[in-house]
A protein has these predicted regions:
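Short, intrinsically disordered, charge-balanced linker/junction segments flanking boundaries
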Residues: 200-202
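Cleft-lining beta-strand/loop regions that shape enzyme active-site pockets
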Residues: 2-197
């Protein structure tokens, strides 16, 4: 189907996510024509790609502004997957850094305040030396150096509770915009109709 100038072509891409699609392109400036095969993606996939790009940009900003002294992690949600990504990053590619920026902005919550408190409250008690060379600090599975946490108005539920615990325990400074105080605890219940799930505040 030809797409006329000014025509909305989005409807042509509906319901073909993941399907290889032939697109014929015409360049009026020089009269050239060519074909490209593309694979449309869903809105969800697009959002994921945009999020990953945003995180990379923030990490690059922190590296540039700190001269490579600080690392950067964003906690997308207070859930296992986000924790594993953060854990791998801080003890992996950022292990050499002097400090870490923990970004919790736009986090919708979950339950991870205790895990984050434990992870970032490490205190060095020895340095392991192997054959005269320093190998690692202990504890080796917690962050023993400086950290700072960023918040914003879009933090919700446990993304309010986590910065509160971080500040209450004196782990580091909390900076950014105020969190609206939305910390809640919810019990998820199913009744006779198992397709219905109710979040009951406790």
């Amino acid at each position: 189907k030809a797409i006329l100038e000014g025509e909305d072509y989005f409807p042509l891409l509906n319901h073909i996510s993941g399907t290889r699609t032939l697109v014929s392109i015409y360049r009026p400036a020089d009269g050239s024509r060519w074909d490209e095969v593309v694979t449309p993606i869903s809105q969800g996939r697009l959002n994921t790609l945009l999020y990953k790009r945003w995180v990379k940009q923030r990490a690059a900003d922190v590296e540039r502004l700190s001269g490579g002294r600080l690392g950067y992690v964003h906690i997308e949600s207070m859930a296992d997957g986000s924790f594993r990504t953060m854990y791998a990053d801080i003890l992996g590619k950022y292990n050499h850094c002097d400090g870490i920026v923990i970004d919790t902005r736009f986090n919708g919550g979950g339950r991870m305040h205790e895990d984050i408190e434990i992870l970032f409250s490490g205190e060095k008690y020895l340095t392991q030396v192997v054959r005269g060379k320093e190998a690692c600090d202990m504890p080796s599975r917690r962050w023993n150096k400086a950290s700072i946490m960023i918040t914003c108005e879009a933090n919700y539920s446990n993304a309010h509770g986590t910065p509160w615990v971080y500040q209450k325990m004196g782990i580091g400074k909390v900076v950014g915009m105020p969190v609206p105080g939305t910390m809640t605890s919810v019990s998820w219940e199913r009744l006779q109709d198992q397709t219905l799930v109710f979040g009951i505040p406790v």
